[in-house]
């Protein structure tokens, strides 16, 4: 499993999608979130959009490999989704540093971690 991690706006989602296009055997782990979808996002493709109550229920049931609350919204990766995908595929994650740290605690997961940064702070500010 490959993890691409970076601060917001650096381009990890764009890079993840390009890798998947070029190497279709890489499946993208689709995270769950409580934030509202953006106009161009598709439920089940970009994120699995759920309510805060649903997310908190999944937390209490210990269903996540990793989760975090960022700017009043939850983001997380369900264990079942990862376990199902990893059986027959290479898997790529597009998550933040908090998620990477939590996933690293699971010794049964073989991880390749890549952290992306940018030296162009002006462009990063424009993206955010």
Which ranges hold each PLM region?
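Extreme N-terminal starter segment of soluble prokaryotic enzymes
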Residues: 1-3
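P-loop (Walker A) phosphate-binding loop of NTP-binding proteins
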Residues: 5-7
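Walker A/P-loop
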Residues: 13
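Post-Walker A helix-loop "phosphate-sensing" segment adjacent to the P-loop in P-loop NTPases
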Residues: 21-30
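The feature captures the helix immediately C-terminal to the Walker
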Residues: 16-17
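ATP-dependent small-molecule kinase phosphotransfer cores
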Residues: 33-91, 97-98
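Conserved phosphate-donor/acceptor-positioning beta-strand/loop module used by diverse small-molecule
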Residues: 91-96, 106-128
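ATP-binding Walker
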Residues: 10
């Amino acid at each position: 499993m490959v993890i691409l991690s970076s601060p917001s706006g650096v381009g990890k989602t764009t890079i993840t999608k390009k890798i998947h296009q070029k190497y279709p055997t890489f499946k993208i782990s689709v995270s769950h979130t409580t934030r509202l979808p953006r106009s161009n996002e598709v439920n089940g493709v970009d994120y699995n959009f759920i309510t805060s109550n649903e997310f908190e229920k999944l937390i209490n049931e210990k269903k996540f490999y990793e989760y975090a609350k960022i700017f009043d919204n939850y983001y997380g990766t369900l264990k079942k989704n990862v376990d199902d995908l990893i059986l027959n595929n290479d898997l790529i994650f597009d998550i933040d540093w908090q998620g990477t740290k939590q996933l690293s605690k699971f010794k049964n997961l073989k991880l390749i971690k890549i952290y992306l940064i940018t030296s162009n702070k002006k462009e990063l500010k424009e993206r955010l």
